Regions:
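Interfacial segments of alpha-helical transmembrane regions
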Residues: 3-31
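Short, charge-rich amphipathic segments
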Residues: 9-15, 52, 104-106
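Transmembrane alpha-helix/helix-exit interface in multi-pass inner-membrane proteins
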Residues: 26-45
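Membrane-embedded catalytic cores of phosphoryl/pyrophosphoryl-handling enzymes
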Residues: 7, 56-138
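Perimembrane loop-to-helix junctions flanking transmembrane segments
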Residues: 48-57
Length: 138
């Protein structure tokens, strides 16, 4: 649905926008693992506490700081919101990203600080890449 909206509104420019979105999500994901999780090595609550009850049977990887889900969805929401420049779209994407991020705590696989870190990292990456996009206007 989002891809359709981008193609419909941006036409020929949409291929570059989709590449930029992929770059943001890729940088958010790789950075959350290689810059944060492997550096801080903070165990997820489901690996640290024996009495954490998981909604699903999977706990995820060993380390949880920062949440890759949170960084990816916030990076996506910010970059799409900035490029498309539509307030209602940004609000909808921001609410969606917040629900996804909250679900990680609800599922018992992240601490709230993991989510906050992911939100900040995703926002940072998206804003840096957006500033480069605006500067070089692909």
């Amino acid at each position: 649905l989002l891809v359709y909206l981008i193609i419909k509104e941006k036409g020929k420019e949409s291929i570059w926008i989709l590449i930029i979105i992929g770059l943001v999500v890729g940088c958010c994901d790789m950075g959350s693992v290689h810059l944060f999780k492997n550096t801080f090595q903070r165990l997820r609550p489901c690996h640290f506490f024996d009495d954490v009850r998981l909604v699903t049977e999977k706990c995820g990887g060993q380390y949880g700081f920062i949440s890759s889900h949170a960084s990816n969805v916030f990076g996506l929401a910010i970059i799409v919101g900035k490029i498309m420049n539509r307030q209602i779209l940004f609000v909808v994407l921001f609410i969606w990203a917040t629900v996804v991020a909250y679900s990680r705590v609800y599922l018992g696989v992240h601490y709230p600080l993991d989510i906050l870190g992911g939100m900040l990292w995703g926002t940072f990456v998206a804003l840096i890449i957006f500033s480069l996009y605006k500067k070089y206007k692909i």
